[in-house]
A protein has these predicted regions:
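Catalytic palm subdomain of template-directed nucleic-acid polymerases
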Residues: 1-4, 20-24, 53-57
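Mobile genetic element proteins and their domesticated derivatives, centered on retroelements
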Residues: 3, 7-10, 17, 48, ...
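Short, conserved micro-motifs composed of acidic
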Residues: 8-42
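Short coil/turn segments at secondary-structure boundaries
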Residues: 13, 87-88, 104-110, 133-141, ...
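A glycine-rich phosphate-binding loop feature that marks nucleotide/adenosyl-phosphate handling sites
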Residues: 13-23, 113-121, 137-146
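Basic, alpha-helical interaction scaffolds
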Residues: 35-108, 170-171
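Short amphipathic alpha-helical coiled-coil/interface segments
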Residues: 68, 93, 116-127, 156
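Extended C-terminal regions of large enzymes
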Residues: 94, 119, 132-195
Length: 195
């Protein structure tokens, strides 16, 4: 009805439905646009983040790690072909692979981030031609780098400060955050981001 009023045409092949729930939904209702049935999916790629029906960000992290891993190996291959110095390769990693790895971390950074740090260390050890058993502290010290989790936590705090800012009190994100906070403090909603 809305589409016909505003004369909008939707591509039904690109429209998907995802039902967010704690467990898998057994009785899936049918969704239609006009007389065309929409597909119900468990995962959906939205703005570069893979959303999962159970609202866990593990699926998004895994997807980002896979993409970053492909970029990392492409960078390693090219840097070996061109015989680039270590400092340049590390700088290229920071500028090309880390943005893929940390994309949307303000949202998923409160979940397990071991896989992200593991990929970062794997790259550094490859570049320095070290064994995988080399202590992580030595690798970070040698390169003068911090674990990517430090950057993730800083970005999360920055996002949270913007979210809580009174300047944003008329924005929907601020209102939703306040509602979630109220539910959290009355023990009606549990959320790792709020705790």
């Amino acid at each position: 009805d809305y589409c016909s009023i505003w004369k909008l045409n939707l591509n039904v092949k690109k429209c998907k439905v995802i039902i967010f729930s704690r467990g898998k939904v057994r009785n899936i209702p049918d969704f239609f646009i006009g007389c065309e049935k929409l597909e119900v999916v468990t995962d959906f790629l939205y703005l570069g983040l893979k959303l999962n029906y159970n609202n866990k960000m593990f699926v998004a992290q895994k997807d980002l790690c896979e993409r970053a891993s492909r970029a990392m190996f492409a960078l390693l291959k090219k840097s070996n072909e061109l015989m680039l110095p270590v400092d340049l390769v590390v700088d290229l990693f920071d500028k090309t692979v880390l943005p893929i790895l940390t994309y949307g971390c303000e949202v998923w950074g409160h979940e397990m981030v071991e896989a992200v740090t593991k990929l970062q260390l794997k790259f550094y050890k490859f570049v320095l031609k070290l064994r995988l058993s080399t202590p992580s502290v030595m690798v970070f010290g040698e390169l003068g780098k911090f674990p990517v989790t430090v950057s993730i936590k800083a970005r999360m705090l920055s996002f949270w400060m913007k979210l809580c800012s009174p300047l944003n009190s008329n924005k929907l994100s601020f209102v939703v955050y306040k509602c979630l906070l109220n539910l959290y403090f009355t023990d009606r909603h549990k959320n790792r981001f709020l705790s």
